[in-house]
Amino acid sequence: MGGQLTKLENYYAFIAKTCPAYELPGTRNCLYRIDDCFFRFWFRFVYKYMHLVEQRKFAGLIELVEKDFDSFLGTSLEHYFRTKLLEGDSYTRAANWWDRKGENEIDLVCENEFSGKVDFFEVKLDAKRYDEALLKGKVEAFLRKHPDKRRRDSRIGLLSIADM
């Protein structure tokens, strides 16, 4: 299976290997994700429910898409902000982070490698769903694993559609 994944990642640029921020090379705690937004949508909604398309049950398909579309948009919004933050001069690294148990996940860990500053962001479609105390707990879990990233000037915050 490794050869096929390598071709899809390196030759076709169809998928991307995503590892938690600051994981050591060779870690097995990585995920492969479809890198193209169109193909992510296609495989998540159209291909998965192709039987509805073939039966011309478009109303049912639309209902299923609407039910899960916010989750799809959430991952797309994370991708947008990761790209946008790296285009600016503030950060040289931006990645997701999660622990092995899956209990803690931080949407964006952004670092400026020149200054050493590390900021943590939660990405939400609906800003009302942001819980700063919950994010602080996740950041503490991150800092227990990576104590060298602890800084007084680190920022914890929210990125939402309003920040686009």
Regions picked out by a protein language model, each given a short descriptive name:
Residues 1-16:
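Short amphipathic alpha-helical interaction segments
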Residues 7, 21-164:
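A cross-kingdom feature that marks ATP-driven nucleic-acid transaction machinery
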